């Protein structure tokens, strides 16, 4: 999910994937930020790299630091052979440089009432306070409901395991992801694939981002615009 990982650094350098539905892949600041990504991942002169499994790379000591989902935290805590620490993502502009993440649970309007009732019961079970605390403590994701954060067992767990509290403390500094990544069908794969061409194949940044903008603009025009304008 390189498209998600790079959203924060991109913001911190003044770039963006989009402003609402206005795509920004070919804006000067976006191009400059992606040029920076290409530079720091240069095999000879860079100081970073992109791997297939950065949790494993970091957990085995091949990488000194990494940016990951909190969903990797519990596994790394159990397997890392060194003292593990977590920290806020850099926010040099003060405008937020950590994107929100995760997924959601929804009930389709077009299914039967019985299935809708079954779905809401399942969602209630998955997200109730007790199960939210269990899930958070055993995976690493931050609790998905505020009552779980205030749960006494959860409070004790986070006091004993402060790495699990970092994301909660950082939440006021987060920003919703740009529309271009989260609302355009297939956009995450397109963005990640474009970055892989740049980082791995060392392709020209401007050309790759121009092609990406054309692809995602077509997706918006043909699949999204007609729906949101109804």
Protein language model features and the residues they cover:
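Short helix-initiation/N-cap motifs at beta->coil->alpha
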Residues: 47-60
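Long, aromatic- and glycine/proline-rich binding clefts that accommodate carbohydrate-like moieties
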Residues: 87, 137-197, 222-230
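Extracytoplasmic/periplasmic substrate-recognition and gating elements
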Residues: 35, 42-45, 77-142, 176, ...
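Extracytoplasmic/periplasmic solute-binding protein
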Residues: 1-22, 29, 63
């Amino acid at each position: 999910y390189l498209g998600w990982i790079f959203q924060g650094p991109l913001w911190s350098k003044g770039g963006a994937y989009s402003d609402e539905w206005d795509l920004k892949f070919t804006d000067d600041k976006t191009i400059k930020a992606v040029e920076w990504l290409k530079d720091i991942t240069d095999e000879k002169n860079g100081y970073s790299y992109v791997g297939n499994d950065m949790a494993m790379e970091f957990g085995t000591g091949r990488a000194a630091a990494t940016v990951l989902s909190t969903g990797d935290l519990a596994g790394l805590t159990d397997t890392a052979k060194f003292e593990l620490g977590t920290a806020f993502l850099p926010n040099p502009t003060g405008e937020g440089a950590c994107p929100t993440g995760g997924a959601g649970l929804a009930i389709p309007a077009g299914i039967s009432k019985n299935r809708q009732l079954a779905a809401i019961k399942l969602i209630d079970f998955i997200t109730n306070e007790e199960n939210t605390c269990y899930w958070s403590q055993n995976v690493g994701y931050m609790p998905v409901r505020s009552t779980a954060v205030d749960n006494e067992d959860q409070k004790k767990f986070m006091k004993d395991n402060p790495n699990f509290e970092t994301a909660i403390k950082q939440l006021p500094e987060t920003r919703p992801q740009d529309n271009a990544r989260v609302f355009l069908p297939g956009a995450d794969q397109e963005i990640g694939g474009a970055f892989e061409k740049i980082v791995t194949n060392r392709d020209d940044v401007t050309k790759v981002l121009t092609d990406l903008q054309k692809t995602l603009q077509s997706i918006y025009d043909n699949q999204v615009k007609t729906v949101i304008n109804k």
